[in-house]
Amino acid sequence: MERPEGRQADQLRPISFVPDIAPHATGSVLVSFGNTRVICTAMVQSGVPRWMKEQNVPGGWLTAEYSMLPYSTGGGRKPRDIARGKLDGRSSEIQRLIGRSLRAVVDLKLLEAHTAWIDCDVLQADGGTRTASITGASVACAIAFERMVAEGRLKTSPLTGHVSAVSCGVYKEEAILDLCYLEDRDASVDFNIVMTEDSQFVELQGSGEEATFSSEEMSTMLELGRKGIGEIAELQRQAVHAALGDADGDAAQRLAEHFNQP
């Protein structure tokens, strides 16, 4: 089986993180999975949602928004949600997934009385925009929280570890990792896997497209996902250390100690 980009079945696309792409955000990164590129920002502001105040819920909150910019796809201009007057169902589903994934690795009590707004804006879509968004948002959060600690706005980072995501699927009767658009379009089975860096599952999304899949195929995809996420988590750690080390070596050291990494 030959993949469109010539990769091996268990090979990720080239992944990169460019920090501080949005200087006014508390933390930001441009994440690239091959030709999929997403700007992920974390804006942390004082105050919590009204429902938390009314119910006397301690700590802070984290929420996410996701959008595909009008020029992000090759199929013509995509109208903005504000022009349509409503959020489309796909974007709504994805931003809820991003929020759930980040809250799995954020101790909201340590966020104190702050709200973290996560924004993921797709610049270019070539498959895996939701998984790239989760992965990039985790890096943006790590940068934002450590900077707040350095500035004295938080006592300690509420991030308990990175969360990463990757797609898997069955393409031409073979399980593969990190699908590009052409593979995703033609795959008979599609999985999205979200995991923490210590290999705990956060969410699994999987379905057949006019097809079924066996427990053996699912196990193979899960193992591919576990392998890929291990590689992604290391890239996330390197990206955060590089971003913080440029301006604050102490923050990079605190982060390593916080995550118990050498």
Which residues make up each language-model segment?
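Glycine-rich, charged/polar anion/phosphate-binding loops
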Residues: 15-17, 24-28, 47-50, 103-105, ...
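A short glycine/serine-rich beta->alpha loop
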Residues: 82-87, 120-129
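A structural signal for small-residue-enriched, beta-sheet-centric alpha/beta enzyme cores
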Residues: 89-90, 110, 128-132, 141-146, ...
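Short, conserved phosphate-binding/catalytic loop or strand-edge motifs used
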Residues: 112-120
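Active-site-proximal mixed secondary-structure blocks
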Residues: 3-9, 101, 147-155
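Short, Gly/Pro- and small/polar-rich lid/capping loops
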Residues: 1-25, 29-32
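Glycine-rich, flexible beta-strand/loop modules in the N-terminal catalytic cores of phosphate-handling
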Residues: 21, 28-111, 201, 205-218
